[in-house]
Amino acid sequence: MIEFHNVHKTYRVAGKEIPALHPTSLRVDSGQVFGIIGHSGAGKSTLLRLINRLETPSGGQIVVDGEDVTALDANGLRRFRQQVGMIFQHFNLLASRTVADNVAMPLTLAGDMPRKQIDQRVAELLERVGLSDHAKKYPAQLSGGQKQRVGIARALATKPKILLCDEATSALDPQTTASVLQLLAEINRELKLTIVLITHEMDVIRRVCDQVAVMDAGVIVEHGKVADVFLHPQHATTRRFVQEDEQIDENEQRDDFAHVQGRIVRLTFQGEATYAPLLGTVARETGVDYSILAGRIDRIKDTPYGQLTLAVTGGDMDAAFARFTAADVHMEVLR
């Protein structure tokens, strides 16, 4: 478990104090995939690097599995960092070393494992990330996705309890991003590894995360289960992320709906309700008519969800709306 207690970070620039992270309290449960999303300058990289003390907090307490890592001396910090792996946006591989040597680097530097055991561990890791045939290649001979897989294997070398991912997919194309995220999900599931990742992409959060924190200007403005946060956003920053992801322009949408008659509502379905024939049932029971103005079906990790924007006319609208609510469908009246 990772706990932040009133942690903050301030940089001193040209004699002025610049806050990068305002006082923050946060908990990441063991075995979770926890996502932190925010635009550039939101403070997410600072927060991530505080976990393994690549950044030193200006105040507050960071506790990992009951240990106060803010109080560790140099030896204690070195020991602690062996329990935390990290992968980076631009891979950070040594160009002059082979794939196998890059993966072996943390074990070689630790200096407490015989070479034969290092070679065995490297072979296991390359098999896990699907690169057994690339052990003797150099980074320049690999694709972006393969380089990131090497980075993941290297991060797992010391058998860490925590894996930190710093914009790990932002330099990859969509197809490669999907395969890397699938690999991270498998690692989380099979190794029971706690993963904390930062990103500016909603799709990354939606695919792999259990919980999410939304950051803006050094503050966590909203956090919780991914479905709760993104299907029912409360803060303006979260709503902007949702609108960007769905490519919604509220002004354009308002103009498009101006000529539409009736009440306009947005329905959000989760789980089994996503595929239930609810609209037809409600229309028959209450006599309302509806037109579908917009809609989508997608998944948040393993959970399907759907959203429909409807124009509702005629019949008993109050009864129809009550029926939606009774069926655990979230309804928002837009007009």
Swiss-Prot record:
Transmembrane segments: none annotated. ATP binds at G38, H39, S40, G41, A42, G43, K44, S45. One of its GO terms (cellular component) is plasma membrane. Its main location: membrane. It catalyses: L-methionine(out) + ATP + H2O = L-methionine(in) + ADP + phosphate + H(+); D-methionine(out) + ATP + H2O = D-methionine(in) + ADP + phosphate + H(+). Its EC number is 7.4.2.11. It is found in: Cell inner membrane. SUPFAM superfamilies: ACT-like (SSF55021), P-loop containing nucleoside triphosphate hydrolases (SSF52540). It is a peripheral membrane protein. Keywords: Amino-acid transport, ATP-binding, Cell inner membrane, Cell membrane, Membrane, Nucleotide-binding, Translocase, Transport. Pfam families: ABC_tran, NIL. InterPro entries: AAA+_ATPase, ABC_transporter-like_ATP-bd, ABC_transporter-like_CS, ACT-like_dom_sf, MetN_ABC, MetN_ABC_transporter-like, NIL_domain, P-loop_NTPase. Residues 2-242 form the ABC transporter domain. GO terms for molecular function: ABC-type D-methionine transporter activity; ATP binding; ATP hydrolysis activity. The complex is composed of two ATP-binding proteins (MetN), two transmembrane proteins (MetI) and a solute-binding protein (MetQ). PANTHER family: AMINO ACID IMPORT ATP-BINDING PROTEIN, METHIONINE IMPORT ATP-BINDING PROTEIN METN. Part of the ABC transporter complex MetNIQ involved in methionine import. Responsible for energy coupling to the transport system. Belongs to the ABC transporter superfamily. Methionine importer (TC 3.A.1.24) family. This is Methionine import ATP-binding protein MetN 1. It comes from Pseudomonas syringae pv. syringae (strain B728a). The gene is metN1.
